[in-house]
């Protein structure tokens, strides 16, 4: 029960943060609130890929790098994303809009290559569609 409560608390903290991450002072507060050690809170925060202890962009792009996506030319999608965003994995665009991350598997093998942006799935990707997807995400977030 405490583990679920901690994960819920960490989700809430991260969602409230402008930079989409878990600041150390708030992880310490979560430890006190839940009665879980600071070390355990940090361990949970760094174990799950949906959490970050470093500032990130407004939108999180996760690209699948597992076998199905790799065999479906995911590397071309990665190259296009890096070119458009001018970032590498683990980096955030200068405008703070996007952070690019890699994922071992998104569970979307039937529509490989695949990625998620803020947990919204995108499959059957081709490099030619990446610019439009990013433009729409950025536009929709301004509404």
Protein language model features and the residues they cover:
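Signature of N-terminal electron-transfer/Fe-S-associated modules in redox systems
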Residues: 1-143
């Amino acid at each position: 029960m405490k583990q679920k409560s901690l994960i819920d608390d960490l989700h809430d903290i991260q969602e409230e943060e402008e930079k989409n991450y878990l600041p150390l002072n708030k992880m310490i507060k979560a430890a006190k609130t839940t009665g879980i050690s600071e070390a355990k809170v940090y361990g949970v925060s760094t174990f799950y890929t949906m959490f970050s202890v470093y500032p990130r962009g407004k939108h999180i792009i996760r690209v699948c790098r597992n076998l199905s996506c790799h065999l479906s030319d995911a590397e071309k999608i990665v190259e296009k994303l890096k070119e458009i965003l001018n970032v590498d994995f683990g980096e955030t665009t200068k405008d703070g809009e996007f952070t690019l991350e890699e994922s071992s598997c998104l569970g979307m093998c039937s529509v490989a290559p695949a990625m998620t942006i803020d947990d919204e799935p995108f499959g059957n990707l081709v490099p030619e569609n990446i610019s439009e997807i990013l433009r729409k995400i950025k536009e929709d977030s301004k509404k």
